[in-house]
Amino acid sequence: MGGLDVRMRDVHCWHGRTAAVSEVDLEIAAGQRVALTGTNGSGKTTLMRAVLGLHRHFSGTVLVGGCSARTATEWAQRRRACAWIPQKPAAGRFPLLGSELLASSGAAGEAADAAARLGVASLTGNPLHTLSGGQLQRMYLARAIGSIAAGADVLIADEPTAALDFDGQDEAADILTGLPVTLIVVTHDRALANRCDRVLEMAAGRLREIA
Ligand SMILES: Nc1ncnc2c1ncn2[C@@H]1O[C@H](COP(=O)(O)OP(=O)(O)OP(=O)(O)O)[C@@H](O)[C@H]1O
């Protein structure tokens, strides 16, 4: 089992002057699979985006494989180390087509193979905004598989099964929990959470371990 360890120490995140995440301390061993659950608006997405450098208004320490990120080069390294399945695509940004999303993994061939296995190969020429929610999640999962083929050792997935049909949820859970990486998955899907090694819960910006 591969993967990198992830360590957070006294992490706080803000949106403007509002604290969204407070005093988060977390140690995840290399290769562990961690489910991050909790109430809507409790700070899960914000915390994951901070790990990736997509939310910069934070304080504290986040180390991935022992490395911090401060410079643009270090943040670029962080994003290569961490595959990412977002809850929703960034509005108005590239890539626009499925094929461009898959190519952004750094391993377009492997991502395209995964897209075929996940049943969305015929949609790769379509603009992302025309895909259904479940088709888009399948495309992002395929991109993540490509990113891992390209060298990512951590997968951060934000509600990756929320839009999938029942069979798709089972299939995605199998794939996610079988990848040779450290997995942090934000989810409200109890079956997926139960398949992880640890379950953490966020409430009002604070984190606690529940299983
Ligand atoms: N761009 C933003 N600007 C201002 N406030 C924001 C922004 N994004 C999130 N927030 C606020 O930050 C808090 C945490 O939001 P976040 O999306 O991290 O929660 P979450 O736990 O992922 O929620 P959910 O389970 O509903 O996806 C919420 O109160 C939310 O309203």
Each language-model region and where it sits:
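Q-loop/switch helix immediately C-terminal to the Walker
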Residues: 88, 94-110
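Conserved structural motif at the start of ABC-family nucleotide-binding domains
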Residues: 6, 20-23
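Conserved ABC ATPase "signature" region
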Residues: 109-123, 145
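ABC ATPase NBD coupling module
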Residues: 68-83
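The feature captures the beta-strand-to-loop junction immediately N-terminal to the Walker
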Residues: 37-39
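Catalytic Walker B motif of ABC-type/P-loop ATPase nucleotide-binding domains
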Residues: 153-159
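Helix-to-loop junction immediately C-terminal to a conserved catalytic motif
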Residues: 52
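Conserved ABC ATPase signature
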Residues: 127-135
